[in-house]
């Protein structure tokens, strides 16, 4: 697979020609900007629809496990299926060397059925994707035209509004969605899941996914390091109205296992091999999958850079709020700004990936001593583990703050537990405390204050309860 991703970028894999035309799809040439450029040096034409053999596999709430095939050549197959005109329609489009019946594609439909009634159409173009990369990148044009043709049939034959269509594309599939969107006026939404870099980054907008392809375009970047020398398959180029860079967008937590542990994976040899070769690249659809069932677990913060985000410079959310990366990104009030918007967040290293960000500020009390301070939050929905807030000289009256990403939303915060230690034997048995701890959840601007007049020895928990009104002034 690694060889396919790297070497095949430079293989020809098809005969050249000037232009080819297909019924209902239009004509495709090997002229610029599609070929003969520095980014696309090889002059290739896309394969024919017959050779690519794109299939449209419909799953609905009524048939969540067995698909119904919709045929471009026979629009009556739509009317004979469980397709419901009153529902939204979400197309899921796989990428390079993948297939429309892959587990993650079908699982995405199944997750949707848990939260909504929807027409979920898996676009299978495996015969066009399981070839050399450069040829597959050119086949994107025909597959995108076919997706647009299917939408056009829905519009003309079933009075279906394109505003109710959502295209979700991974890797090359993101650019398939872009091609389809550029052919479909009024398309509602496109989600690009780590749009691939090679042959697309730096090209004109008509070649790649861009914000003009739908009324709303959101993009998740998970493998945006340069292809050479880091083998980053995804693009770093801003491609939507909202671009999300989880964990900085280049190196995902949990993707640095050794080769054997990654390949001998719980999901099997094939899944394990895929994860070893393209773990960062695949994380984008795994985050989206989980976001469907976690409507508030992927809050993302506007920030100039991931460095600023990690330096706690982008907290809390601004007045208009923060978007949720993934399925619910379209709920964000500020989604349709004129300028592209960049957002950052952190995730877990494995399922569950969702995280909830908190800021904790504390005022120390007690003796001056060197050590580290930790805090745990307890709320109506559960409690966090202990998180490091400060290491260094613990000085009475000093204020320290830090942010952390918890594995759960604790709900209404009821109390805070404070712990300190210096891991050095101190015969004077000093006592330290927190006179006040202020907690703020990322999506909220409200601050919650907890107070205590007590001090404790190291490795002894101190519980702080909500301050009396006079204590918070």
UniProtKB/Swiss-Prot annotation:
MF term (GO), any: calcium ion binding
Kindly state which keywords UniProt assigns to this record, in alphabetical order. Calcium, Disulfide bond, Glycoprotein, Metal-binding, Secreted, Signal
Where, subcellularly, is it found? Secreted
Where is the secretion signal located?
1-17
- Check the record and name the CDD domains matching this protein: Pancreat_lipase_like, PLAT_PL
Question: InterPro entries, from UniProt?
Answer: AB_hydrolase_fold, Lipase, Lipase_LIPH, Lipase_N, Lipase_panc, PLAT/LH2_dom, PLAT/LH2_dom_sf, TAG_lipase
Q: Which GO terms describe its cellular component?
A: extracellular space
State the disulfide connectivity.
21-27, 109-120, 255-279, 303-314, 317-322, 451-467
The source's superkingdom equals: Eukaryota
Which residues are modified by glycosylation?
157
Matching Pfam families: Lipase (PF00151), PLAT (PF01477)
Q: Domain PLAT, which positions?
A: 356-470
Question: Which residues are annotated as active site?
Answer: 171, 194, 281
User: Where along the chain is Ca(2+) bound?
Assistant: 205, 208, 210, 213
Q: Which GO terms describe its biological process?
A: cholesterol homeostasis; fatty acid biosynthetic process; high-density lipoprotein particle remodeling; pancreas development; response to glucocorticoid; response to peptide hormone; triglyceride catabolic process
The free-text function statement in the UniProt record for this protein reads:
May function as inhibitor of dietary triglyceride digestion. Lacks detectable lipase activity (in vitro).
Q: Say which family it is in.
A: Belongs to the AB hydrolase superfamily. Lipase family.
Q: Know the name of this protein?
A: Inactive pancreatic lipase-related protein 1
Q: Which organism is it from?
A: Rattus norvegicus (Rat)
Q: What is the lineage of its organism?
A: Eukaryota, Metazoa, Chordata, Craniata, Vertebrata
Please state the gene responsible for encoding this protein. Answer: Pnliprp1
